[in-house]
Amino acid sequence: MPCGEDWLSHPLGIVQGFFAQNGVTPDWEKKVIDYFKEKLKENNAPKWVPSLNEVPLHYLKPNSFVKFRCMIQDMFDPEFYMGVYETVNQNTKARVLHFGKYRDVAECGPQQELDLNSPRSTTSERQTFYCVPVPGESLWVKEAYVNANQARVSPSTSYTPSRHKRSYEDDEDMDLQPNKQKDQHSGARQAGGLGGLHWRGEPKRLETEASSGQQLNSLNLSSPFDLNFPLPGEKGPACLVKVYEDWDCFKVNDVLELYGVLSVDPILSILNNEERDASALLDPMECTDMAEEQRVHSPPASLVPRIHVILAQKLQHINPLLPTCLNKEESRTCQFVSNFMSELSPVRAELLGFLTHALLGDSLAAEYLILHLISTVYTRRDVLPLGKFTVNLSGCPQNSTFTEHLYRIIQHLVPASFRLQMTIENMNQLKLIPHKDYTANRLVSGLLQLPNNTSLVIDETLLEQGQLDTPGVHNVAALSNLITWQKVDYDFSYHQMEFPCNINVLITSEGRSLLPADCQIHLQPQLIPPNMEEYMNGLLSAVLPSVLNKFRIYLTLLRFLDYNLSDDITKAVEDDFVEMRKNDPQSITADDLHQLLVVARFLSLSAGQTTLSRERWLRAKQLEHSRRSRLQQQKSVNGNEL
């Protein structure tokens, strides 16, 4: 373990040291960031940092150094806080400067008072993100992160393990101050807030107000607090994330790994209740709006903890089996990629066999499923996303559990996914599109608020005849826009705002999908298992965990390979296409060339090749010919269904 645990258990002490050494000059802030950067470069140091994703909140010590893997669900307005404030000793009149950065509560020592009029005080600005665990994150990803984390935590002196059993609306008396900290602040006399920081009150008063918290919250939080997760059934903490540097680099739906100071001070809930009570003196309508916004933006810290970010990194992916950043020219990353690429061919062959079994013996469909799973939007030309490869797997057995179990297979392979059951009822009732709630001043999530590289499986096999109402029509249109343009238009009431995305969409259907797709492959099962669940479970249990991990690395890594076509290859492809048009002018179009190039691109990448060879071009033509022939055969059997 890295030598010394102060940076983990008492990061604010480290910050205080730099502040004391450097005074109010900007140097101290940079030195703090550099210090923690260097600490995290030490051998396995990130694994020693407790993670809010894996460790229950009641096991984490307040004001300790933590990490959090999350998605930015919303961005609140910037807020001002006391960057530097001054206290005065009532007896000696000695003045002391304190830093307000990385804090929600201004600390006052014994016999000290906060000087609100000090000319040495400074006001600074910070940005607040509302962050949630990565939507749709696969169970194998969570388990891998848990197994890799070496942080040793036990229930803190501030929490008890039974705390998490309390209902959301209760934030009753619970002393969150370690004994040591209580002694330090026993002389404080004030309570209140200024510039984003609250200052601590008399301990007896604190305990009295905390004991009345249950009554206050039963009035103000009469309904359970909505954590605003995009997907149903999601678990884990939501956090208010305070960002101090470079917040313009981040945007909604970015996936981040954050390192910072955990703040769960109960005085936040107490003072927020006081502010809500005070707002009752205002105009009733204005009071209602303000109370709702206050409730959403300042929830109980025991339910939505705060993280004061020291370091933040935007994640390219969340696959724990790969290096975090795949673009850096680091020796370890290069070595990892080189080693894996050397054994790519057998991994692809095994994956093809595995997916062939999952697709009931259909090896052609398995080929296209591999191409789909490694596809990604690599650039945009005007509004057109290049690299998307939405596949419609038609011919799926109706009234069967096949699509459900196929999705389970995909869940075991990709880091994040979601299955949307496309029924008339769901289309009419589900909230797919995020919308702005102006009363609470927040972005209310929808099912399509997903991070990049999520696999979205739309299951049409349950779709029956029925009437779509207006919300249903809007939802279907939203899915079509997502597939065609790789964007979701968020609803801001008075206008729509485009949010570009990079979502892999697989549509399973009986006939041709109602939704647009880049490629339709009709399933031709070679076997129909009498017990689908038993068959699929047997398929999963037969794969060694080490082999399954290779599949996971393969599907993530190939998305990040660069791919280029030389002028010679481009000319050869164009000449070949001209010959194809001569031989079959009626059925070969420019769209067919585009489709062939997309298939050839991902076919090459699936073999670890970053440019197109003649062999891969011929193989792409062969695959496309087989796929089209199959569709024609099916069309002649079923009329115009396909």
From Swiss-Prot:
Residues 151-161 have a biased composition (Polar residues). One of its GO terms (molecular function) is chromatin binding. The modification Phosphoserine is found at S154, S167, S298. The keyword Phosphoprotein applies. It comes from the Eukaryota. One of its GO terms (cellular component) is MCM complex. The modification Phosphothreonine is found at T160. InterPro entries: MCM_complex-bd (IPR019140). GO terms for biological process: cell division; DNA-templated DNA replication; sister chromatid cohesion. Keywords: Cell cycle, Cell division, DNA replication, Mitosis, Nucleus, Phosphoprotein. Residues 151-200 are annotated as: Disordered. It is found in: Nucleus. Belongs to the MCMBP family. Associated component of the MCM complex that acts as a regulator of DNA replication. Binds to the MCM complex during late S phase and promotes the disassembly of the MCM complex from chromatin, thereby acting as a key regulator of pre-replication complex (pre-RC) unloading from replicated DNA. Can dissociate the MCM complex without addition of ATP; probably acts by destabilizing interactions of each individual subunits of the MCM complex. Required for sister chromatid cohesion. Interacts with the MCM complex: associates with the MCM3-7 complex which lacks MCM2, while it does not interact with the MCM complex when MCM2 is present (MCM2-7 complex). Interacts with the RPA complex, when composed of all RPA1, RPA2 and RPA3 components, but not with RPA1 or RPA2 alone. This is Mini-chromosome maintenance complex-binding protein.
